């Protein structure tokens, strides 16, 4: 079941909406979803529904609420892509991390929650997934094709919970020197895993993307499920 109209208060009093999906059987672990640059759009709704079908609750906060609340853009529309890039360029990453922390806190204390919370982020959200993991806010974090990870490597020692990252070998946002830095940097912390999908570029896991690579997406999603599975455990 998907629910809208949820309001969450952040660290500074700012409030934002969220899309929430609750599973048939509760309590369950909750996955907070950090959006791409296109807002809480059709792919985010698809991701919430998919996680619910796998037995998770899901919360997808509107991270653009500070700029343009309710943004839900179509990546296939050139004008909307331009709008997304402008929103991304103006996005406050520190505030985004704070808003995700508020969403995680909200998720952890809902009646449908078993108290365990993971995070899955894409693109912008993939970068936020790493920053949230470095803060220790979630039990497990997964990031897809996060942009700018090579600029955050000083935070690698701060990651205290398992985190998994899926990166496209052909991602134009991650040139070869950045790839090397990420691989070596993440290798310094055994809690961090990074998989490179050589045939894939950016947004390879978004089903509506012209860059969608079914084989890479299927493998990444399978690894994601295996990685998140411990959250289903009844053990503390």
From Swiss-Prot:
Catalytic activity, as annotated: 2-(5-oxo-2,5-dihydrofuran-2-ylidene)acetate + H2O = 4-oxohex-2-enedioate + H(+)
MF term (GO), any: carboxymethylenebutenolidase activity
Catalytic residues as annotated in Swiss-Prot or TrEMBL: 123, 171, 202
Entry protein name: Carboxymethylenebutenolidase
Reported function: Ring cleavage of cyclic ester dienelactone to produce maleylacetate.
Naturally occurring in which organism (per UniProt): Pseudomonas putida (Arthrobacter siderocapsulatus)
Disulfide bond entries: none
GO biological process: catabolic process
């Amino acid at each position: 079941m998907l629910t809208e109209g949820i309001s969450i208060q952040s660290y500074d009093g700012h409030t934002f909406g969220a899309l929430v999906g609750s599973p048939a059987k509760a309590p369950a672990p909750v996955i907070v979803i950090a959006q791409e640059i296109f807002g809480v759009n059709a792919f985010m709704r698809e991701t919430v529904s998919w996680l619910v079908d796998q037995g998770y609750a899901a919360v997808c906060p509107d991270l653009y609420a500070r700029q343009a609340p309710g943004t839900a853009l179509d990546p296939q529309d050139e004008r909307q892509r331009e709008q997304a890039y402008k929103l991304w360029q103006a996005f406050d990453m520190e505030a985004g991390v704070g808003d995700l922390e508020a969403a995680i806190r909200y998720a952890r204390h809902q009646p449908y929650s078993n108290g365990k919370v993971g995070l899955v982020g894409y693109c912008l959200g993939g970068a936020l997934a790493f920053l949230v993991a470095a803060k220790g806010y979630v039990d497990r974090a997964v990031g897809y094709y996060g942009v700018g990870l090579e600029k955050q490597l000083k935070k690698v020692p701060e990651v205290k919970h398992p985190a998994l990252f899926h990166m496209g070998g052909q991602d134009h946002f991650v040139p070869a020197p950045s790839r090397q830095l990420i691989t070596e940097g993440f290798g310094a912390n055994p809690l961090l895993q990074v998989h490179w999908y050589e045939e894939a570029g950016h947004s390879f896991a978004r089903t509506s993307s012209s860059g969608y690579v079914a084989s890479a997406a299927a493998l990444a999603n399978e690894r994601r499920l295996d990685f998140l599975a411990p959250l289903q455990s009844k053990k503390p």
